[in-house]
């Protein structure tokens, strides 16, 4: 009998040894895949042309075979294949890795193993097996038809609700003639809004209605504009003009308001709404606070041209004001405002989204989302609270919606760069600033502090002592016992340099070799030996105290404000007579039931270890930066509203007016707000409407 011997090559022998090592790790299951299944049919989709594919596991469509698994060569260590294969199968609840259901397999004639993902190959094999039993058996779901999803409950109601609840459409009389609202199709060169944006209402804002509101007071006033709908506002960045009306839906969620009625009025373009019952002379409808379903009004587009530009505000207005308050006790409800485009709404004149047009944008990014990024515009520490005041004021680093400021600093904290001149025989402790390298206003350094000293003092060597009754071991700061000669000044770290002449007869080099030292800076009137308070800044009123030179030289200094010399228990910037300004001091007062606020942060004080005092800021620094550099559109009688929420779900609205000051609808704020806070832009509302809030009852009056 003849015996046939098969000679194995070195690669074949090495491959067999490699498979034996895998068998030790996986068990006897590891081996060659002997199922007679065409890999084309197993993995390649039917819609792909596979007639010319001779290597499906090195396919031109790598995304098709990504689900098969990782390909390993037999030269890869078996331990590596096993470890990485286990890593793709997840873990048990106790953290142990799951053993793969299907071990690596090789296709006959190749020297590669395929470590499959869980279930991929098994699923394909079972699908083919099922098809051999019943050719009509489908292994995939047919999702070509639309599905209708329905939420079921035990409560009564119809099971056939498949669309959003729309509300009650209010018939407005007299209705404008349809021909007056028609848009010429030839005037639109852009594509109309897709149907999906036309079918549902999107949240716009919410307003409060209290039964103590006077009859005729304006609760809501909105001019027709794409910005009142979030989707229209987004799409508007692609177009230059628009036309058409907008539907507005109101939902009243009451808290015991019975018998009250609201009036919805349509005010034509060119007419400014006033707070009076005479507004009912305009076309209007009334709706009751007891209305359980939403009510829908349409703001028609009444225009004398074919289209509106994006910055046009002289359009039809929808105004809501109280017509009747039916109860004597004070009670409040919330009115949710939602919008959607009307059927005739369209955009026109396509433009690139990055191109700028002259009108401003929506003020939706003035306050950072997280309070960890809130820094004051008077001092550079993080905001830690709020102070509600009947009057708020600040000039330096305060900007309005016209991108203007009455101050002298940019909305960034940069080192203060100044020049000081020393002379023989003069006071070598107190100096005037003679020049500056960086200035928004000529002669006044960028970043120079904006408060002055509280009282007249002597220009002495700077006694930094406290009264004799001060006890060094005491843990209580007694600022009234501060007897230093330079209280109210700002403590700065300094880098100083001097120019050394070739013929150094006055030994200026000795002065240059002195170490940089602390400087105390302030705005004051310094003459002879007297330093007086000065609330109007000028290049001649910039005073510096430090152990200065006794030579005739000019010194350049770069200062960084680090702290403050304590004056009394009042926060820095809380007394208007001590706040420095160039000419006028911008101010904000209570209006429409809303109160102006300061943003409060901490500033370190000298002498006391780790001690701080409060500092008042008129704006968050990011707000100052946005207003200085951006172009925002906000009417003078409106507020850009942000909802501030703490970690305990308390919230209140902050409104920023056209002058850049911030308001809240409360006369005081709780002292237990849980930081960090979050900010959400809520839209634009009238400044005369009280801002909403939901905070705990136990509050303290801010000081």
From Swiss-Prot:
Which GO cellular component does the record give, naming just one?
T=3 icosahedral viral capsid
Q: Does the keyword Phosphoprotein apply?
A: no
Which Pfam families is this protein grouped with? Calici_coat
Highest taxon above the source species: Viruses
Q: Positions of the site: Cleavage?
A: 152-153
Cross-referenced SUPFAM superfamilies: Positive stranded ssRNA viruses (SSF88633)
What Gene3D superfamilies does the entry give?
2.60.120.20
Q: Which UniProt keywords apply?
A: Capsid protein, Host cytoplasm, T=3 icosahedral capsid protein, Virion
Annotated CDD domains: rhv_like
Summarizing the function annotation, the protein's role is: Capsid protein self assembles to form an icosahedral capsid with a T=3 symmetry, about 38 nm in diameter, and consisting of 180 capsid proteins. A smaller form of capsid with a diameter of 23 nm might be capsid proteins assembled as icosahedron with T=1 symmetry. The capsid encapsulates the genomic RNA and is decorated with VP2 proteins.
Please describe the quaternary structure of this protein: Homodimer. Homomultimer. Interacts with the minor capsid protein VP2. May bind to VP3 and Vpg proteins.
Identify its protein family.
Belongs to the caliciviridae capsid protein family.
Name of this chain's protein: Capsid protein VP1
